[in-house]
Amino acid sequence: MTAPPLPTAVRIRDVGARDGLQAESPIPVAQRIALIEAILAAGVTHIELAAFVSPKAVPSMAGAAEVIAAIGLRAGVVRTALVPNVRGAQMAIEAGLDEVTVIFSASAVYNERNVKMSIDQSLAQIEQICSLDEIPPVDAVMSCSFGSPYEGDIAPADVAALCVRLRSAGATNVTLADTTGMATPRRIGEVLELTGTDVGMHLHETRGTGLLNAFAALQAGVTRFDSSVAGLGGSPFAAGAAGNIATEEWVAVLDDLGVSTGIDIERLIEAAMLVEAFIGRRVPSRVAHAGPRSRRASS
């Protein structure tokens, strides 16, 4: 049997400066800006810069407006930030962002613990955000799309129904997130069979299946992926949750498959090692340390 052809190109949104750093001890704004510049210099054209959240709740995201102002408009680059509520969305509008991400969960218990709202309340808030004047495109990131540590499996039909409700609320795009690392290639296929492939994928390496799941989604026809430089990330509401798939590891796979990303992997590895210097510990990305398979040993 001949496998269907892979997409010729994918769009990667690097979330390292927000999702990657939010679980770390705070680093100076100047270092966050330097990291973003390094990621952009590698050719990344879609990047999550910060989150408009309370600095008391998430100290590592203090200074979001300062970070965004320092980056400014970039031709061909989509700059996004996480907004947890209407006030955060208003701040994002004032900052002139190209996109905002909102968080939502397919797990009722996780949603309650994360944003202190029911699923219906979250959908109502997302609708409010989407109806704001001058709101940029909204990407609704649905956590626990492939399972919850509280309820267990989430039925693919329920995930598909929530995608419909999110789009009805005004979301421009929907991204399916494997927040707790419960996805498998089989479950990826089962969900995509009902949601269709016009979704993004946000995958974690909690159980070491992140890249396998990304490849399964790619084979199904998905072309939008979140990943984090150096493989940082996690969730304070999911015990043991590991980082996102590392951008440089996913790019290394895609390069070998002949799938275009527009990203220079060696420059991206430089950004990953910058992260390591800033946080003061070894980052989980294996490609950041071993390099891509195309790298040759020095004589």
Language-model regions, residue ranges each:
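Catalytic cores and adjacent flexible loops of soluble metabolic enzymes
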Residues: M1-S299
